[in-house]
Amino acid sequence: LYVFDMQNNVRKEIKVAAFKNQNLSLSYKPAEQKQRDMEYVSPVWLGDNDRFFLVRSSRDLHRIDICSYTIGQDSIVPIIQERMNTYQETRPLAVLNKGKELIHWSERDGWAHLYLYDDQGNLKNRITKGPWHVEQVLKVDEATRTIYFVGNGKEEGENPYYEQLY
């Protein structure tokens, strides 16, 4: 990973290595509703002018780290670490309260659910639970602390593959 200082025309290599043959991907802000039909939307990193977020994963996807990088530092910092002996999927991170809180999607209990963390990686609380699957977070209303998400398998007597908005 390289960070470029465009004003001074200087590049800086950031230390990111943790796993052999790892994958590193930037986390991006979701596109705004008004941009959904645009042919090209410039990606904007998830974060602010001081810090942004990345996902680092092992090749076999048994180890996944949600990391942050603070501008000016020499390395990224793992905030949330997921370790399983099976393949894991990931979903985009949701950032709240100007980066002080994070909503993380995880399959750690065998189901896919949402967890609230502080910006240091401390689990504040589990948001969803039960024998059903959260597919994705669509929107977070920070004023009311309401999360709109898609899930399936929660409603009894309904085909578990039908997705619902919650």
Where are these regions (language model features)?
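A short loop-to-beta-strand structural motif that recurs across blades of beta-propeller domains
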Residues: 2, 65-67, 113-115, 164-166
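Extended amphipathic secondary-structure runs
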Residues: 2-14, 48-57
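Multi-bladed beta-propeller domains
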Residues: 5-39, 69-92, 118-141, 152-157
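Short catalytic/ligand-binding loop motif for oxyanion handling, primarily in non-cytosolic enzymes
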Residues: 22-23, 61-63, 113
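Beta-strand C-termini and the immediately following turn/loop, strongest in propeller blades
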Residues: 45-48, 53-60, 69-70, 94-110, ...
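Residues that flank catalytic or metal-binding motifs in active/ligand-binding sites
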Residues: 62, 75, 161
